[in-house]
Regions:
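Flexible active-site lid/hinge loop adjacent to a nucleotide/diphosphate
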Residues: 1-49, 128-129, 133
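ATP-dependent carboxylate-amine ligase
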Residues: 18, 30, 47-56, 60-201
Length: 201
């Protein structure tokens, strides 16, 4: 394996069931630096302070382009993410954001907090491989995002919502219970709909 640029966006407590702790996650990710043709071509997103994720990501891209001596003008820059990794689907005059490939409660919170809770609906599935504290992490997520209209599914969320009674949180068991008609109405009303979860859900 060899690469021209290595970008580390962040280190989060993902896949704890495999790596056990965040220190092991950090070591594993940083070991990928060995693939670099030039050790200087490393963009460390951990040192980029910006509360807005999109602005932080733009800065990461700018630094990577600079390392590759590519024009930094991002006005004409286009990027199509892989399925489930942030695809934006234009529908009924609004947007569906598809982040169903993978998710972590912390990143869901950070992303959602940048949105207007009165104009955004969240559809969340269980997030896997979080280790022993997975229920607490899901519970914390719902507590932090209590102002949003939220639809949840999955075994973890089914247990967690029992501890957080809220008129804003709705559970659906399966595809048959999926609130399609309601979400279409929200899109037509100009609200964004975020889908976030793991492939397992």
């Amino acid at each position: 394996l060899s690469c021209d640029v290595f970008i580390l966006t962040a280190i989060a407590a993902n896949h704890l069931s495999t790596f056990k702790n965040i220190e092991n996650i950090s070591k594993t990710k940083l070991k990928l630096k060995e693939c670099l043709k030039s050790k200087d071509n490393f963009v460390d997103g951990r040192g980029i302070e910006n509360k807005n994720i999109l602005e932080k990501n733009k800065e990461i891209v700018r630094r990577a382009l600079n390392l590759l001596s590519i024009d930094e003008d991002l006005k004409n820059f286009t990027f199509t993410p892989s399925a489930g990794r942030g695809n934006i689907i234009k529908l009924h005059g609004s947007e569906i954001i598809d982040q169903t490939y993978n998710a972590h409660p912390d990143t869901v919170i950070a992303t959602a907090m940048e949105e207007d809770s009165s104009k955004t609906v969240l559809v969340l599935g269980d997030m896997a491989e979080l280790g022993e504290d997975e229920n607490k992490k899901h519970e914390n997520l719902l507590s932090k995002l209590a102002d949003f209209q939220i639809f949840v599914t999955g075994k973890i969320f089914k247990e967690v919502i029992k501890k957080i009674p809220s008129k804003n949180i709705n559970f659906f068991e399966n595809k048959e219970d999926f609130p399609k008609n309601y979400l279409v109405k929200q899109l037509k009303a100009g609200k964004k709909v975020y889908f976030k979860g793991s492939r397992s859900s």
